[in-house]
UniProtKB/Swiss-Prot annotation:
InterPro entries: P-loop_NTPase (IPR027417), RapZ-like (IPR005337), RapZ-like_N (IPR053930), RapZ_C (IPR053931). Residues 7-29 have a biased composition (Low complexity). It comes from the Bacteria. Residues 1-29 are annotated as: Disordered. Pfam families: PapZ_C, RapZ-like_N. GO terms for molecular function: ATP binding; GTP binding. ATP binds at G37, M38, S39, G40, A41, G42, L43, S44. Keywords: ATP-binding, GTP-binding, Nucleotide-binding. The lineage of its organism: Bacteria, Bacillati, Actinomycetota, Actinomycetes, Mycobacteriales. This is Nucleotide-binding protein CE1710. GTP binds at D88, V89, R90, S91. Belongs to the RapZ-like family. Displays ATPase and GTPase activities.
């Protein structure tokens, strides 16, 4: 993903409802969004996508100015009904100030959805090198030092974020699709399930809540007439899903999700990522992901999307 390091992009957003700070606090469906994360992880892309979806987006607002902005936008007579704030380490008041602002918003029944964008160190270094820019925290030190400083500064915020997106393996188009799907989910007030197929040889998704290994199924790669196809093609899909254990696996996994999703919803976790892997990410994981998405997509309380990360990778 060729993204300017200082920019920012969001990941799937979770509708968060927090209790009123007092019995007289007004109920509201207004949910502000705070976009933050590692420099170079795609914050600007996220901001542009939200703007295209009708959000009012402000960039690099000091944390102490977020509360007045959100309160103004939350008023009944405000022309703005969706507001997102991009906040990164370039703000002098970032350290500690953002966490304090989030607490203040929660106390006023304006709990924000916090989106955190991340990427591997090696990928961040590559992106900075591509645009020949320095990291905002590196000073006279190396780029790696700047990234390490920022990662340490943001560790608590990442842990508490409602949504974390790892953009290391995402193209700009992949990230746009993920963001569009996630933010449309906010209005629906449903749980969003992203099913991501991948190849273990290329590494597992870092942002997955579940990692499922589909390598227990026979590999269509070794069937000459199926090798040129992919898991989205009917011959491969029929072959994979007809294997012993495939149907039982899907039934059991969905039953497990049925037990867990209500608990996730109660805890305010409305974005779940399921990673399904096989060797290369071309056949078994793709076919199983498509079938799982088809079954879950029939449910009105779920918004389901599918990403085939490695399907076109050699």
């Amino acid at each position: 993903m060729n993204q300017t390091p200082g920019s920012t992009v969001p990941e799937t957003a979770t509708p968060v409802t927090s209790p009123a700070s007092s019995p007289s606090a007004p109920e509201t469906t207004f949910t502000p969004v705070i976009i933050t994360g590692m420099s170079g992880a795609g914050l600007s892309t996220a901001a542009r996508v939200l703007e295209d979806l009708g959000w009012f987006v402000t960039h690099n607002l000091p944390p102490q100015m977020i509360l007045p902005l959100v309160e103004m936008c939350a008023r009944e007579d405000s022309p703005v009904d969706k507001v997102a704030v991009v906040c990164d380490v370039r703000s002098r008041e970032f350290r500690g100030g953002l966490r304090e602002t989030i607490t203040e918003l929660e106390e006023k029944n304006l709990a924000p959805t916090v989106l955190f964008l991340d990427a591997r160190d090696d990928e961040l270094i590559r992106r900075f090198d591509n645009v020949r820019r320095t990291h905002p925290l590196q000073g006279s030190q190396t780029l790696q030092v700047g990234i390490e400083r920022e990662r340490q500064m943001l560790s608590d915020l990442k842990e508490e974020a409602d949504v974390v997106i790892d953009t290391s393996e995402l193209s700009v188009h992949d990230l746009r699709r993920a963001i569009e799907s996630s933010f449309r989910t906010i209005a629906k007030r449903v749980q969003h399930v992203t099913i991501e197929s991948f190849g273990f040889k290329h590494g597992s998704p870092r942002d997955a809540d579940f990692i499922i290994d589909a390598r227990f199924l026979p590999n269509p790669f070794w069937v000459p007439e199926l090798r040129p196809f992919r898991g989205v093609d009917k011959p491969v899909s029929d072959y994979v899903l007809s294997q012993k254990g495939a149907g039982e696996f899907l039934d059991n996994f969905i039953a497990m999700l049925d037990d867990m999703l209500p608990g996730y919803r109660h805890e305010g976790k409305n974005f779940i990522t399921v990673g399904i892997g096989c060797t290369g990410g071309h056949h078994r994981s793709v076919a199983v992901s498509e079938e799982l998405a088809r079954r879950l997509g029939e449910r009105p309380d779920l918004d389901v999307s599918v990403v085939h990360r490695d399907i076109n990778r050699n």
